[in-house]
Amino acid sequence: MSETAAAQPTEATASKATERFRNGGKAVIATLAANGVDTVFGIPGTHNLEFYRHLPEFGIRAVTPRHEQGAGYGADGYFLVSGKPGVVITTSGPGLTNVITAAATAYAESRPMLILSPGVPTGFERADVGMLHETKDSSGALNRLLVSSQRTRTAEGAAQAVAEAFAMFASSRPVPVHIEVP
């Protein structure tokens, strides 16, 4: 399969997912399922429940360790045994930063990992209003450590970012990617 052919199906699945869903969490999970994801790792928390709420609907299993670092290493190990990119769903703030060590390991070993995190609502970025686990610029911080870290603004943008991550895993050096979904 050529690099271009590998990228095309995921772009189509992102469009298909957002045609049906207005919700960013549901669009992300639908796009994960369309890309063959059957397992995610992470800890459900206040800000990421919209991801977890849709997992059963798409037949995706959640593995919930006791610490986010364990989720990151679980996703990395999942790739080693399955050959599929590992997916981590974190909470914002400390939940996200706890995954960084596992992501750095995956980066050094050229292993694909998709890190999904919630973010403050659109319009409140860098507002410093005291929201729970508010961080000034999660994507900016991770962008210095990973090849790609981006914040999406819409359900369509979130699904497209997930599709692009899977296209990148198939067409270039497979390393961790972070997507922040408000």
What are these regions (language model features)?
Residues 2-182:
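N-terminal alpha/beta PP-like core and its mobile active-site loop of ThDP/TPP-dependent enzymes
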